[in-house]
Amino acid sequence: MGVLSLVVLASSNLRAQDAAIGNSPLSQAASRAVMNVAASGYVGNAACARCHASIYESYESTAMAHASGPAMDALTPAEFTHKESGVHYRIYSENGRAWLSFERPGDPEVRGRRELLYYIGSGRRGRSYLFETDGFLFESPVNWYTDKQVWDMAPAYQTSREMPLNLPAYASCLHCHVSEMQPPAKGTDDRYPNPPFLHNGVSCERCHGPGAEHVAGGKIVNPEKLSPGRRDEVCMQCHMEGKVAIEQPGRHAYEFRPGGELSDYVRYFVLAGSQTQGLGAVSQVEALAQSQCKKKSGDRMWCATCHDPHFSPAAEDRVAYYRARCLACHGSAFAVKHHPDQPDCVSCHMPASQSSDVAHTEVTDHRILRRPQVEPQLLQDPSQEASLPKLVPFPANGNRESNPRDLALAWESLVESGMSAGESQAQSLLEKASEKSPNDPALLSALGYIEQKHGKAERARSFYQRALAIDPDLVDAASNLAVIEAKSANSRAAVALWQRAFQLAPGRSEIGLDLAREYCLSGKIDEARDVMLRVLEFNPDLGAAKGMLRRLNRASPSCEP
C-alpha cells in the first residue's frame, strides 16, 4: 500500500555524508568467508561437496552459484559522471574494502562515500551492490552492466536529476540472489540481522531443501521427482515476477522450501491475454507458458528440459548445446530441412532483446516464437487502458484457486501503481474480502488507502485505526493516518504516528518531510531540524529536504516545503 504525503516530492531521489560504517556489524559480516551456518536443517554447500564433488565443481561454474558475495570479490574499479544529475561517481578499493564515492562539483552538500558490502548478480548481465546506513541495507545508485561493460545508474534512475541513495534492499528481491535469508526486523523492509544472509549465491539447498536429514542418511528433495506443479515452483520462486505478487498472511516468499507449495507463501497475478509487457529480466516462467512448445508439451516440458541447473556450457559450445536440446523434441530430419545453413536455433527463435526493466541488459525471449520477426502485439500498460484489464492468477491451473483477499490486494496494488480506473474494482473486491476476513490488517489498510484517495477521511481513519490496533508496525497505515490527523488539526496524534513510521523507515523521505513540517507548524523548530538532518543522512541529494532545512535555519523559519 502506498503513502499519501502532505509534502509532494519533485522526485524520489537523494544524497549523503560520509558514514562511518566500516566497522559496523554488517561490514564485518561481509568481509568474512562464506558462512555455512546450520539453521533449520541447513548444512551448506561444503557438506554436499563431500559426496557430490563432480556436481559441486560443475555447479560452481554457473551464474546461480555466484549470484551474490562480498563486494571485494567482484569489483570493477572505474569512475564516471552522470550527465543528468551532474554527480561524479568513483568505484574503488582501499585497504581491502570496496567503496563508492560521490560528489557534485560546486555542491558541497553532495559529497561522501559508502562502503560497498555485498555484490548482487552473477555478472553475466550485471551487478548491483549493497551498502549500509545506520543498520539499514540499501542498493547502490550505480550498477555494473556487463553487456556494455559500463557503470551506469540503477534501473529507473537513468534520467534522475538527484542521486538516489535510499533504494531499499527488499527481502522480496534479495532472497533470489542469496541463500538462508534472514528476515528483516519487524515492521521494517530493509533492516536485517547480522549477517543478512548465511550463504553467498544460490546454494544447493535453495533447490533441494535443507540437507541435514540427507547428510544423516535420509532423503532430500529432488525437484525432478516432484509433481509437475511442485517441480516447476522450485524455479518459479525466482524466475517468475508477474504483474503483481501477493504474500500470504504471516508468510514471506523467502520462507518457501522446495517440495512445498509456493502459493502458501506468495501468489502471482498476470494480465489475461497479455504477451508480457515487454521482456522483463525475471519474466522467463510467464514467457515460457505462452510458448507453443510448452502448451503442446504440457507437464513434460519444464526449465530443466533445456537447462541443466548444475552446468553452464562454455560460450563456444552454447549453440551446439542448446541445438541438441531442441532436436531432442524436433528431430534431426526436421532440422536438416529447416535452415540447414543456420545451426543456431536460439538466435532466431529465442533472440536476445533489450530488457524492459533493466537498462543496458538483454534477455532471452522464452516465448520461443515460430516466426520471431512477426512479434505478437504487446498489451500496453494497464494504467493507459480505456477499459479495465482482467487480472488472473498464475499459474491459471494451479492447485489452489486464488482467494478473494489475494485478488483484492492485487487490484489495490494496481491502483497504487497508477491505474486510477481500477479504484472502484479494488474497493468492491476489498470490501467483499474483508467480510470474510474482518481482522486482516492488510485488507483494512488497503481499504483505508482507497477511502482516503476518495476523500472519505472518517472512513479511512476507521480502517487505519483498526489495522494499527492489530499490527502497530504498519508503516504506510500509520503515515497515511497521520496525514488525516494533521488535516484535522490533531497535531499530537499526527506527530506520534509519523514518529513511529519514520523510526521504522528512516529512508522513506516523504514521511520525514511530513513529520518535520508538522513539528515546524507546532513551533518545534529544533525537532524539525533534527528530522531533516535524519532525512539527509539517508537521502543527501533530496532537494525538498535541503530546501526545507535552509528555510528552517533562517532567522524567521518557514514551514513550507
Task: Describe each region flagged by the PLM.
Residues 18-39, 46, 54-122, 126-133, ...:
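Primarily the internal scaffold of c-type cytochrome electron-transfer domains
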Residues 453, 487-488, 521-522, 551-555:
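Register position in tetratricopeptide repeats
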